[in-house]
């Protein structure tokens, strides 16, 4: 069974940077050794945002974006190797999620698309890459997401305490770690995505630092109620979503009914939308004693305070409190999934994704010997 140093690479729907994590992984433990966040150039970020919102582009433009992202991921890995004074031979493999540009797991031909050419990463780092993690699960009738609950269960499940893990990235997803029950998990809806999109358009800021804008505003209750009527929120699990659904266009359609509002009030309403949709799903899933939060949203003091207020009787903490950096959780998960793929072990959980069976995930792009 393969064991040793692995690297995980994650560029999520928030597009707030490429997260790269170095860890030692074997069948008994996952030990994080180092991490860094690598910036995404503004032009590249905008190109991804455009395609995620349905903007048409030529096959040439699509191919160029795929190559550019692959090179970006390789640069991020090489920066971590240099920082840690490591060589390619010191790493077993890279687990690279890629950049999701479309996720449509239902319909006549279900599909998901992550780009960032893994061949570029192999060529530029000299390290074997495991990628394309989601499509096998979809081929077996699953949602292809979320995949991280399996990792959450391996690291954070407790024999007696009812626990849930909440990742608040662009999309928020919940892992249900309830003793005596199959592991559950699904996307609850928007996490940071709409908040980030709004403040970017209104103030040119990539995110609402320390929730300053949202805390200066007041929730627009009619707007909140209008958004909560979206059918996704009442859809039963398994379910998953992404930027192709919850995007700036979705927000604009709701705002048409409420013109002229203070931008800070809209920001406050979007923060409340994220908090309410998450807390409702926690309660509908039976509640928990401890909710452990990771992802960029765990650094949002307003979100954390609202979750605690909406979930009385639940201890709301970050995963940092149990020794796992909330900023690095997803990248670490894909390093772990790469280890499982090379070990020939399944990486999905049918109880989470709805797939017909467990399966080994991903495709392997081997480095030259």
From Swiss-Prot:
Recite the lineage of the species: Bacteria, Pseudomonadati, Pseudomonadota, Gammaproteobacteria, Enterobacterales
Q: Which reaction does it catalyse?
A: 1,6-anhydro-N-acetyl-beta-muramate + ATP + H2O = N-acetyl-D-muramate 6-phosphate + ADP + H(+)
Give UniProt keywords alphabetically: ATP-binding, Carbohydrate metabolism, Kinase, Nucleotide-binding, Transferase
Enzyme Commission number(s) from the entry: 2.7.1.170
Q: What class of enzyme is it?
A: transferase
| UniProt-listed InterPro entries | Anhydro_N_Ac-Mur_kinase, ATPase_NBD
The protein, known as: Anhydro-N-acetylmuramic acid kinase
Q: Which SUPFAM superfamilies match?
A: Actin-like ATPase domain
Gene3D superfamilies, per this entry? 3.30.420.40
* Pfam families in the record: AnmK
Please state the pathway this protein functions in, per its UniProt record. Answer: Amino-sugar metabolism; 1,6-anhydro-N-acetylmuramate degradation; Cell wall biogenesis; peptidoglycan recycling
The organism of origin for this protein: Escherichia coli O6:K15:H31 (strain 536 / UPEC)
Family indicated by similarity: Belongs to the anhydro-N-acetylmuramic acid kinase family.
Ligand binding (ATP): 12-19
GO BP term, pick one:
1,6-anhydro-N-acetyl-beta-muramic acid catabolic process
Output the Gene Ontology terms for molecular function: ATP binding; kinase activity; phosphotransferase activity, alcohol group as acceptor
Q: What does this protein do?
A: Catalyzes the specific phosphorylation of 1,6-anhydro-N-acetylmuramic acid (anhMurNAc) with the simultaneous cleavage of the 1,6-anhydro ring, generating MurNAc-6-P. Is required for the utilization of anhMurNAc either imported from the medium or derived from its own cell wall murein, and thus plays a role in cell wall recycling.
């Amino acid at each position: 069974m393969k064991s040793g140093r692995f690297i995980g690479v994650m560029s999520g729907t928030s597009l707030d940077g490429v997260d790269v994590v170095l860890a030692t992984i074997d069948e008994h433990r996952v030990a994080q050794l180092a991490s860094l966040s690598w910036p995404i150039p503004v032009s590249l970020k905008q190109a991804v945002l455009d395609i995620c919102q349905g903007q048409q582009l030529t096959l040439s433009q699509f191919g160029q974006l795929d190559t550019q992202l692959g090179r970006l991921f390789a640069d991020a890995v090489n920066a971590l190797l240099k920082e840690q004074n490591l060589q390619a031979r010191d790493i077993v493999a890279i687990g690279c999620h890629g950049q999701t540009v479309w996720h449509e797991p239902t319909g006549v031909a279900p599909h998901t698309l992550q780009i960032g050419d893994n061949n570029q990463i192999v060529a530029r780092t000299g390290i074997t890459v495991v990628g394309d993690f989601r499509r096998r699960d979809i081929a077996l009738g699953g949602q292809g997401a979320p995949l991280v609950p399996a990792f959450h269960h391996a690291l954070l499940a407790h024999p007696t305490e009812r626990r849930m893990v909440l990742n608040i990235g662009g999309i928020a997803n919940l892992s249900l770690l309830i003793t005596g029950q199959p592991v559950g998990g699904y996307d609850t809806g928007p996490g940071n995505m709409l908040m980030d999109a709004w403040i970017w358009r209104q103030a040119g800021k990539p995110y609402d630092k320390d929730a300053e804008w949202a805390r200066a505003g007041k929730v627009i209750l009619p707007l909140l109620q209008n958004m909560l009527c979206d059918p996704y929120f009442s859809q039963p699990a398994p379910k998953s979503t992404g930027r192709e659904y919850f995007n700036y266009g979705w927000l604009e359609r709701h705002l048409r009914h409420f013109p002229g509002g203070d931008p800070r009030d809209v920001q406050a309403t979007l923060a409340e939308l994220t908090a309410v949709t998450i807390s409702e799903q926690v309660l509908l899933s039976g509640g928990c004693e401890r909710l452990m939060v990771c992802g960029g949203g765990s650094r949002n003091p307003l979100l954390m305070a609202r979750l605690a207020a909406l979930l009385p009787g639940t201890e709301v903490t970050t995963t940092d409190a149990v020794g796992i950096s909330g900023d690095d959780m997803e990248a670490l998960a894909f390093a772990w999934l790469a280890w499982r793929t090379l070990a020939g072990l399944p990486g999905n959980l049918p109880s989470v994704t709805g797939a017909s069976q467990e399966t080994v995930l991903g495709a392997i792009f081997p480095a030259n010997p």
